[in-house]
Regions:
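RecA-like P-loop NTPase motor core of helicase/translocase proteins
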Residues: 1-217
């Protein structure tokens, strides 16, 4: 049959040579277990930031399949001398911050765009179907300085891109459910949420065990 016909017969849709569209590079490397996939991912962050994104201080979201792996990866990326950390410090020196979701609001607004920021999280944290993990998409007053800083920089033009994203704006239903009354003045405006803040920075995304991750979205 050939690979194209065999693919179509197996999955019921045409084979696409550009898996993620014409504007997204797609390279597949087969690496055995223990072959150094994670250290390659660490080296990929500065390479992609420069060659593809053309930025000197990227934001990278590093997603892992479990909390145990999140803790291991976080420790490695934060430990001086560890190969994962060394791959990043070689490129960024001390202008580097590695953090978890709960620490994002503690990074000062001016640091975004000046230091490389690597956010380590579980894939489950961004699954919108899981009500217990929806803090990523919730309105958070702790991000007020960040969104007000973005608003002040260009009169809010930068925030306009969020209007095209799903689940990014405060709705009338959100305001009705809000017992504090804070959201009444934000209906139709972007949520002060972690998901929106990350979207503004168009992060690189590293997905550990991506071959075991799938979505209907």
């Amino acid at each position: 049959q050939g690979p194209v016909q065999a693919f179509g017969a197996l999955v019921g849709r045409p084979y696409r040579a550009d898996a993620f569209g014409p504007d997204v590079p797609c390279v597949c490397l087969r690496i055995p277990t223990g072959g150094g996939k994670t250290v390659m991912a660490a080296h990929a962050v500065p390479l992609l930031a420069r060659a593809w994104c053309n930025v000197d201080a990227p934001v990278a979201v590093w997603l892992v399949p479990s909390d145990a792996i999140r803790q291991q990866t976080l420790k490695a990326l934060q430990t001086p001398g560890h190969p994962y950390r060394a791959a990043l410090t070689t490129a960024y020196g001390e202008a580097l911050q590695v953090c978890v979701l709960d620490e994002v609001a503690q990074i000062a607004p001016p640091d975004w765009g000046r230091t490389a920021i690597v956010l380590v999280a579980t894939i489950q944290s961004f699954r919108i179907e899981d009500a217990g993990q929806r803090n990523v998409y919730s309105f958070s007053e702790s991000l007020e300085p960040h969104f007000k800083s973005a608003q002040a920089q260009d009169g809010g033009r930068r925030l306009q891109c969020l209007h095209a994203l799903p689940d990014a704006l405060v709705t009338a239903e959100d305001a009705a459910r809000d017992r504090t009354g804070v959201l009444q003045g934000f209906v139709g405006q972007p949520r002060w949420s972690l998901a929106n803040w990350l979207a503004l920075h168009r992060p690189l995304v590293i997905v550990d065990e991506a071959h075991n991750t799938k979505t209907d979205k």
